[in-house]
């Protein structure tokens, strides 16, 4: 992602402090998302046996992360202020989809409705045409009229 943002000169701030904040959020996502997908998602939705301790432990961590995001977005349009960048793309792909798409059928369990700022931010990003295209790739179709693209080989796959 960083390579592409640098190569095309978009979505990555060039000013040092703005770039550092963007990279901090990008690396925050890399360090935190495994708790959401690999931890919470696995034990809550996919594990053959349901154990209360890991479900509660990972749920607590996911809620803490949602709280971090919600507080940051309280006075900001995007993660780093007024400008959309790669950190928004990376974080929204996990946490935005959790609050908007009821990932793992856990919206009620995690009380995602209480994270109003995360929802507002995710809704705005989810309306962006490029984000809409990106969420179609490598996702299992949910029905006969679904526009999911299992594998992408060419830009025309998104037409």
Per-range role (PLM):
Residues 10, 71-83, 129-134:
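Surface-exposed helix-capping loop/turn segments at secondary-structure junctions
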Residues 135-159:
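Acidic/histidine-enriched, glycine/proline-rich intrinsically disordered or flexible terminal extensions
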Residues 5-6, 31, 74, 100, ...:
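Residues at helix-coil transition
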Residues 5, 94-95, 135:
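Active-site-flanking alpha-helical
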Residues 69, 88, 125-131:
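Residue-level signal for nonpolar/aromatic packing positions in well-ordered secondary structure
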Residues 36-41, 79-107, 113-120, 125:
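GST superfamily/GST-like fold recognition
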Residues 1-56, 60-63, 70, 159:
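GST-like domain detector, emphasizing the conserved glutathione-binding G-site
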Residues 58-66, 94, 121:
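Alpha-helical packing segments of well-folded alpha/beta enzyme cores
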